Amino acid sequence: MKLKYFDDTDTLYIELRPAAVSETRELDESTTLELDQEGSVCAITFEHASTRSDLRKLTVEGLAA
């Protein structure tokens, strides 16, 4: 999993797993999902990310070794 934040556009991109994207679905005006050929979510994009969450703090829980 990769998290990327783009300060210039206030966009948070969360890649759940590397995959070829075959479809993009808009959940709302600020959130999009990227789907692979099987329809599984492989990435999520959040526009206006800093207004939706406190990006100064990231907590990871239950991370498997």
Predicted ranges, named:
Residues 1-65:
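Small, basic N-terminal interaction modules of short regulatory proteins
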